[in-house]
Amino acid sequence: MNMKKLIIILNILSLFILTGCENKKDVNYNSDIKVNGPVLKISLIQTAYEIYELHIKNTNNEPIDNLYDGSSRDAKKHYKWLIKTYKNLDSDMIKRLENIFESNSSWAYINSSINLDDSSSTSDIVNNLISDKNLDLSSDVENDIEVFFNHFNNEYFNKYFNKRKSSLEKKASKLNNILYSNDVNIEEFINKVCGVSLNTNYVCTFYYSLNPISSQNFEYENYIISTISPNTTVKDLLRVPFHKYSHALFDSFNESDEFLEICELLKADCKLVSVYNDSNNLAYDFNEWCEENLVEGFSKYLDYRYSQYEYDFSNFVYDLDFYNYLRKINFNPDKVNLKDACIDFYMTCIDF
């Protein structure tokens, strides 16, 4: 074998490795999805909250460290950095950190900053938070935000962030190369599976975060924004748009008499009601809770149809059951529409 042929073969093998040896007929990825490296407007707040959650919020000393230890080597290093940084904070800074996140959640602060430019500085972030009336900050907390985040970034976070940023930007570039080279439209795929036409014009944007154990989702205008952990794969990215697009499908019938009637009957379902009550009713009313179980189940089904990923875990009460139901009936919109499939499924839950 001459050297030229060897180089060609090696190039082909490297392409298969990069794409995970997937058959493009089975797994295709939407090039409308964009992956970015970490940005300060997210990671500064998110990482400060991790320190708060580990050392201040976790008053019961629950073994959160197990979540980091069970993730990856980088996750363990990140956990050690969080521990070391907290130990170096003086009592005044710890109190300011506590005041900040007792006043608002990490999500609320990042949501306030999410439409800032990706190159925004600490000063830009602080000024935005202080001026945001929706956060309803007291003058004391405004001062805490200004003092703490500037100190935290200058003394600890800036060096750590820049050290991690380069490698995560390289990962983002690799994922984008895969996404762009497999130019398939998720919306068109859903239209084919469901037999309906969507026109959502959503733009899905992902930002790598330093947090290895959790993610956050945000929306503004037509943008769907999610943070992703450092070990996220291309397949993981698809689950967010699948869930969001599913909501658009359910919007076509979630106010229909038939759907509202089944939601009323489900108020007799002890398990569904119990989990709903335990969630403090903050995110949904009961009808929306019934819908959310179906949406999550349907998004799982879409992911299965798209990538052949088989689910065995539940996020709500009936999402996994609905996913399995759709697989069992081999859901076909030419035979049964989505609304009828949802109502038929919930009727089996009520009958049981």
Where are the regions a protein language model picked out?
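Sec-dependent signal peptide recognition
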Residues: 4-11
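Pan-zinc metallopeptidase signature
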Residues: 297-352
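Auxiliary, metal-adjacent structural segments of Zn-dependent hydrolase domains
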Residues: 160-218
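Second-shell loop/turn segments in exported
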Residues: 171-180, 228, 280-286
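C-terminal motif of bacterial Sec signal peptides marking the signal peptidase cleavage site
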Residues: 17-20
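Long, mid-chain structured domain cores
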Residues: 84-181
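Post-HExxH zinc-binding segment in Zn-dependent metallohydrolases
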Residues: 26-108, 253-320
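Active-site recognition of the HExxH zinc-binding catalytic motif
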Residues: 235-256
